[in-house]
C-alpha cells in the first residue's frame, strides 16, 4: 500500500528528495547547511552534504531553500506528487 502524502511539508521535502534538488537549510542558530534531502520523518531530516549524512531535528530548522522552485501537481492516481517542470 502506498502512503498518501497529504501535507505541504511532506510534499516539499519529498519533492526535493525525489527530484534530487539541492537545498540550503537555515538553522535557528544561524548556521547554513547545503546538500540533498535523503529522507525525513515527523521529527528529523537526513541531509547528504559532500558525501556525509547529517540528521537534523526539524525543531532546529528555520527555513529550507531549494536551488530551484518546487511546483507540484498530484498524479491522477492520487498517491504521489511530482515536479511540474
Swiss-Prot record:
It comes from the Bacteria. GO terms for cellular component: cytosol. One of its GO terms (biological process) is regulation of translation, ncRNA-mediated. CDD domains: Hfq. PROSITE patterns: SM. Residues 10-70 form the Sm domain. InterPro entries: Hfq (IPR005001), LSM_dom_sf (IPR010920), Sm (IPR047575). It holds the Pfam family Hfq. The keyword RNA-binding applies. Keywords: RNA-binding, Stress response. One of its GO terms (molecular function) is RNA binding. Homohexamer. HAMAP family: Hfq. NCBIfam families: Hfq, PRK00395.1. Belongs to the Hfq family. RNA chaperone that binds small regulatory RNA (sRNAs) and mRNAs to facilitate mRNA translational regulation in response to envelope stress, environmental stress and changes in metabolite concentrations. Also binds with high specificity to tRNAs. PANTHER family: RNA-BINDING PROTEIN HFQ (PTHR34772:SF1). This is RNA-binding protein Hfq.
